[in-house]
Amino acid sequence: MCYDDKARPPMPPTNGGQAQGQDLVLTAADGNQFAAFLAQPESPAGAQILIYPDVRGLHGFYKDLALRFAETGVRALAIDYFGRTAGLAPRDDSFEFMPHVQQLSISNIFADAQAALDYLREGADRPAFVVGFCIGGSLTLLTAGQDLGLAGVIAFYAGMSRDFGGYGTALDRATQVKYPVLGLFGGADPGIPPEQVAELDSRLDQAGVPHDIVTYPDAPHSFFDRKATDYAAASADAWRRMLSFIETYSRTST
């Protein structure tokens, strides 16, 4: 598990704007209904971002993260993966996520992502990014191989060994990535060996896309957490890199 119910995202360095959040139910092309949370900035900065959660789906950490993005001016939409198998119920600590993770289909993930991006673009035709955490980081890298018109993707501690129903792992598909990538990893994360991170960097070179792969040497998996004060400097740097990445590739995508 990546984040529990007590986890909260660190505050961004440029926080100070106002934001409004609302729960939504979106519908994919196949009729699947899934939960989402939209955070709307009072003063939009010209970009928007789709948030892929960890294995627990759309829980409080990601609703808060959407609001933190919106407070920097970035319109944000966090989505849940499990509408097809777990319905629309809240995803708290009692949610038994693994049976639903095992039923995930990559084609269904892409369908839900398309519906979410369509919703964002209907409300504002601005550059769109994707950010994901843990399994969401893996899915972010896989999504980056699709023709979705993204400006860039950001992957936190993306696992590279999960094969989604024979589609291949994030590492298998890395040479097919189409958009700029910011990858953020913990050097003390036992689940993601440094050799895999180095191989991801190499395969993104082969893909020919701009990329910045960053490892924080002593940080564990899930270091990006307000209560993980030992890694506050890494979290602050991750925020700075994310906002700079969004600003840079918002300009180049227009």
Where are these regions (language model features)?
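N-terminal cap/leader regions of alpha/beta-hydrolase-fold enzymes
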Residues: 1-254
